[in-house]
């Protein structure tokens, strides 16, 4: 589990459905700490108090942490990726009407380490996980476009934003600005 997640917490173990829960692994994780294979500490704010991590994971987190005055780079991850903590170690952000899940084919755009935009499987719907604001939406869409183009996706056709037809929403001009081509019922991005 340490190899898969890098950091293991009570919530991670519960999400994995390990028989006996966290207490069944705690002794082994403590042994790995004594052997120098794992570290125990409080590495990620908001996760449980007892956190065990591989040394490389801790160093990677430190590298990714923005310095004073710097803004964190946006990150697009598969919603089901073990490195994506929402829906496993962390609850999805609560926002009226927002629905997100750890399903194959869906993606999450993280801004500053926080889930901002959920891309449903197939890309037909974009679900904001925080109140929509132009500044962060522009940043999230730019990251999504970069991800789609670098991943070799044939096309991304967005039909809905926040449960509304995309053509009727305030995000359409931002999609066009990001490189999408408007259509009668959707905005399409081709690599």
Residue ranges and their predicted role:
Residues 1-191:
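Long, charged, low-complexity, helical-prone intrinsically disordered regions
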